[in-house]
């Protein structure tokens, strides 16, 4: 991890840093192929972050390890964790997705009550979830459903619907 870690405390701040529009203050789906990550590669997120890497021959550093994501890999970070998103050329990924969601989004939902049971959020820094092509397709479909819900006006059902997709 480099000396200059960008601390991102909110979903809105994350959107601003990555050149995305904020559609909901507590959740965002960010397409890394459209993100502007030229000025930073090391991040500390103040919210849950799920990173789906679709890049070939790129690596991320999480903890003290680098990961080679040749087929598709999922990293799940809890609020306060850091990640270095760069490959061997010190450039950021060009393909993948970030699902960023604040703990307040899942408060009072089944996901909020059970998130500690999802062990992939408590993996050691040298662990990650490698996903099959079919698993990646399912994840992308769910991200698309979240994005579709975000395109609608926020209402009393948004939180429950989005948390079910997560």
Task: Give names to the regions the model predicted.
Residues 135, 165-166:
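Hydrophobic/aromatic residues within well-ordered alpha-helical segments
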Residues 152-165:
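All-alpha amphipathic helical-bundle segments outside canonical DNA-binding/catalytic cores
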Residues 75, 80-86, 106-107:
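Histidine-centered metal-chelating micro-motifs
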Residues 55, 79, 101-103:
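Residues immediately flanking
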Residues 88-153:
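A hydrophobic/aromatic-rich effector-binding and dimerization subdomain
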Residues 64-78:
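Short acidic-glycine-tyrosine-enriched beta hairpin
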Residues 1-61, 65-68:
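Generic protein-terminus/edge-of-domain signal
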Residues 29, 50, 74-76, 98-100:
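Conserved hydrophobic/aromatic beta-strand scaffold that supports enzyme active sites
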């Amino acid at each position: 991890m480099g000396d200059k870690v960008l601390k991102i405390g909110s979903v809105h701040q994350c959107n601003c840093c990555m050149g995305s529009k904020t559609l909901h203050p507590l959740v965002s789906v960010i397409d890394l192929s459209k993100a502007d990550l030229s000025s930073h590669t090391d991040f500390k997120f103040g919210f849950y972050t799920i990173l789906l890497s679709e890049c070939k021959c790129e690596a991320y550093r999480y903890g003290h390890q680098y990961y080679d994501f040749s087929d598709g890999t999922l990293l799940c970070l809890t609020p306060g964790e850091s990640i270095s998103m760069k490959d061997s050329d010190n450039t950021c990924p060009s393909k993948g997705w970030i699902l960023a969601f604040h703990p307040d989004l899942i408060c009072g939902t089944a996901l909020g009550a059970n998130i500690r049971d999802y062990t992939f959020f408590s993996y050691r820094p040298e662990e990650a979830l490698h996903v099959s092509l079919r698993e990646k397709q399912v994840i992308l479909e769910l991200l698309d459903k979240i994005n579709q819900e975000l395109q609608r006006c926020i209402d009393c059902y948004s939180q429950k619907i989005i948390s079910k997709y997560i």
